Regions:
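Lipid deacylating catalytic domains
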Residues: 1-140
Length: 140
């Protein structure tokens, strides 16, 4: 199971090797994931305004859906209220404490990087290519 569905969370934890492990949501926590993230100068999270791929949209910023109660729909849980943050399984709370978390929304569909989004992500956080031709090609 690839999808993290709150109403089937136990099944997700039992069978999702990819997301469960990289989110440190399994019974055994991988300290190297947390250590690696904490070495970052900044952790930049980008979500897309018209995204239909990432559900819930909050999960682009490590938010989630709650486990629904009887007769109630699941509700969005922002990052700072999620288990991964509160229990600091990945070091996100520690990064946040030192001001290293960055949250951005780019206009458009999932991974459809507009020139403005490319400028933000690559210009501000990654760095511009050394060759001006490459920068122009990225913005084409």
């Amino acid at each position: 199971m690839y999808k993290r569905q709150p109403e089937r969370f136990e099944e997700y934890v039992a069978h999702s090797r990819f997301l469960r492990d990289i989110n440190n949501e399994g019974a055994a926590k991988n300290a190297s994931y947390k250590e690696g993230l904490q070495r970052l100068e900044q952790f930049v999270m980008v979500r897309f305004s018209d995204d239909t791929t990432v559900r819930p949209p909050e999960s682009a910023w490590f938010g989630a859906h709650s486990v629904p109660e009887a007769g109630q729909p699941a509700r969005p849980v922002p990052l700072r209220q999620s288990d991964v943050y509160v229990r600091d399984w990945l070091g996100l709370a520690a990064l946040d404490k030192r001001g290293a978390l960055r949250f951005h929304t780019c206009d458009g569909m999932h991974m459809q990087l507009s020139p403005a989004c490319k400028e933000l992500v690559f210009g501000q956080y990654v760095g511009r290519p050394r060759s001006p031709g490459r920068w122009l090609a990225m913005n084409a």
